[in-house]
């Protein structure tokens, strides 16, 4: 799975929203691993030229997730999910809807990579909170 985040424009921090696995094919994982990590990972060794970070979370990323591999956020993905829910693990929009909980995308599915966008174009915490509040199942 790949951790996906939203952006806090006030601080530049990225808060996790979900882990995406659905919609990704084996071929995609191989290509993504080669592109981001510089080659296949074996025996937990860091390939030469790897973007892999030695420890996580990546700088500026706020999450309750524990990931085996971390790299600097630089790719924008378009994802779709069933709905948004409050989460003790994911940290996007903490304080905007609930004092301690972030907002998470349930049943996320990868749609496509967005090479035309940068991290500065990622969904903001305010946008995620607005989409959460707009759901019909959320009490107003």
What are the language-model segments listed below?
Residues 11-140:
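Intrinsically disordered, low-complexity regulatory tails
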């Amino acid at each position: 799975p790949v951790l996906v985040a939203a952006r806090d424009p006030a601080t530049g921090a990225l808060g996790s929203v979900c882990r995406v696995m659905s919609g990704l094919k084996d071929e995609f994982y191989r290509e993504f691993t080669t592109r981001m990590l510089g080659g296949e990972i074996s025996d937990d060794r860091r390939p030469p030229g790897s973007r892999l970070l030695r420890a996580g979370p990546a700088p500026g990323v706020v999450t309750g997730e524990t990931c085996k591999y971390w790299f600097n956020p630089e790719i924008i993905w378009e994802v779709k999910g069933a709905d948004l829910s409050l989460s003790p693990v994911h940290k996007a929009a903490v304080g905007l809807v609930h004092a301690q909980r972030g907002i998470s995308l349930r049943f996320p599915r990868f749609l496509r990579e967005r090479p035309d966008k940068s991290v500065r174009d990622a969904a903001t915490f305010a946008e995620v909170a607005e989409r959460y509040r707009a759901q019909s199942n959320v009490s107003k």
